């Protein structure tokens, strides 16, 4: 036998549950155990580490590098040394935030490494949306890896419940936190919070659509879209100095694309519930009940597009 090496993911891309713009969601103690077993077996000649980028994954990469260079290193001790070096006087607050990040991570299956990266808060939502717009109530086999359920409604309910739990686990952003924390771990937790909130609403919209409640489904799809746009805006808001436009080509998870698909879903739901003439919902939203009962053959005002109708619904607080 000759030299041996490993191929290890600090981040990865699977169109399912991977992490690309956020740190590995499994705790560093998990990495410690895995790489400890590697070293125990003498596999230390060659390590290939997959990282989609460096900036979002700096802590994970630094920890792997430490183990590679110096051998087994306790995860807790490394975290403390890392936050002292990277965050300086805010080290204690940073350590708390990192531990909160790992504690909040959502498990989607029974195994220790069935931990959801931010792609889980995006890709299953897109799969469900696409399946709904194709029509029918049968399940989507693209989700069989995690939810091999017989109907689309059951898969949507499964995803809704997980996303609700995920959104609950992550804290709202603290605008008074140190800038470096806002640029890193706090930003990543906010991305999860927003995307999970959007995923839950997207699943609710699909369930309402399957039940024929198209107007409420349309509104929830609009709310979901706003959550994903807010996640993308959070990323872009932390671009400054040499990091300008850093997230502009965020294309592997592509949070903004989830928002685009939700706009398509809004159009689909409006067609189902308000087509082919597209005036009933507008009258229902803009008019008083008495006015809405008076129907003319001709239109007296322009049709609202989907986003304008959604904004009118928000104003009416439907």
Show which residues each predicted segment covers.
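Substrate-binding groove of N-acetylhexosamine-processing glycoside hydrolases
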Residues: 1-318
